[in-house]
Amino acid sequence: MAYDLSEFMGDIVALVDKRWAGIHDIEHLANAFSLPTPEIKVRFYQDLKRMFRLFPLGVFSDEEQRQNLLQMCQNAIDMAIESEEEELSELD
């Protein structure tokens, strides 16, 4: 069965409820959608970070939790960019 919107939203809620999210939690979301290329993953992580940034502060237990989640999104973006650059350098 394919990963659907209700599962995605459930994972988002669980992630926001989690005190200390790790990069593996962020990568799980992209992996669940089986995103095919690093470029698409970069855009997905950027949109995910943008979405978390738009959440009201009251959704998070405190500012530190919010900043941690945003930082994990940024780490995922950075790793996906590195993967994309490696993929491009292999083509040369």
Swiss-Prot record:
The keyword Nucleus does not apply. Keywords: Plasmid. Disulfide bonds: none annotated. InterPro entries: T3SS_TyeA, T3SS_TyeA-rel, TyeA_sf. Interacts with the translocator YopD and with residues 242-293 of YopN. Involved in the control of Yop release. Belongs to the TyeA family. This is Protein TyeA. It comes from Yersinia pestis. The lineage of its organism: Bacteria, Pseudomonadati, Pseudomonadota, Gammaproteobacteria, Enterobacterales.
